[in-house]
Amino acid sequence: MYIKRHLETTIEKLNSCFKVLLVTGPRQVGKTLFRGLAAVDRTYVTMDDISVRSLAMTEPALFLQRYKPPLLIDEIQLAPKLLPYLKMYVDEQGQNGDFWLTRSQAFELMHGVSESLAGRIGIVNLLGLSHGELIDRPAGPFVPENEFLLRRVEESPLLPMSDLFDQIWQGSMPALNSASEQDWNCYYSSYVQTFLQRDVKELAQVNDELQFYRFLCAAASYTGSMINYAALAKEAEITAPTAKQWLKVLAAAGLVYLLEPFMHPNLKYGVKAPKVYFTDTGLAAYLLRWSNAEILEAGAMSSSFLETWAVMEIYKSFSNCGQIPPLGYYRDFNSREVELVLNVDGSIHPLAIRKSSSPVKETKKFDILRPVTEGERALKLGAGGVICFANDLLPIDARNWYIPAGLL
């Protein structure tokens, strides 16, 4: 079953603006769909083919004579020597849309690309399926303004808690959301093994797979939480500097998203540590051994998984439109926290996330953000709300809403 990806429209726009297009993202999130998009008029080559890779590495000029644009080059990181020749080609005779490149992770390739193809390349990041893609809803950045939310109500069916936790546990990988009967445990077992055996050895120079696996499981237990490197290191039996470096590896691989604190000169008492979110809740559930959705929903980490899912849905709503997600969070030294702060067009939009159908008094803590409305760098305090399991979109006050999770 083919599920249309929201990023396809963004690809079409960038293709008309840049000579080179790079698609990055974690393994198995659906980058092969671009092979389908390219099938009509674009040659496809993969650097997994040793003969093609050998030609690209030893005779890059000859490679470009053999494979003319428009061209899709898969796993470009395996042939880094080709990048300077791509630059020369597009400078001398390139046209917009000449080359599409795909890469399973960002890592060191991004440094090489930024140096070799600066100003010539459009970069997009593909993650797993969004809720909007699964229900075939139009794409668009999630900004909780009144008009947007009222339109979303018409586009989105109600999502009961049990159905949402089915989706959270299942995860966002296309292979697990297609018509094929893919075994969940077998899929994620293979996924983790591939990551450890190929990516970790190649990109983190880690030879002890078991040690990194312990770290990966420990990191999963922090999803939806502020990171404490010392505690994470103790749990994984490594040093704190190593834990910090390995978490950066997971972020570069696209397995986790580090949500930085929202900063403003008028907010002087906020914590500075990031929060960590696994980009695929199914992978986090597998690593933490939640064996089914019902147990996860009733478990101690259910709220953390709900927050992870909600943050990543909002993140994807921006990234799938080719925008850098304007997300942060704010927590003061009195442990008052706004789970998500969207900074859009001079306004901040505070959001709380609760596993409840009728959370109360959650918007009062939004007042800790009021100092940003004063001074030279003042921002407006825009519409916000509480993402929850309310049966309908309901106003809390003149500015805030109870937002059913299915609207994300």
Identify the function of each model-found stretch:
Residues 66-82:
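Conserved P-loop NTPase "ATPase switch" module shared by AAA+ and STAND
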Residues 107-123, 135-140:
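Short regulatory helix/loop adjacent to the ATP-binding pocket of P-loop NTPases
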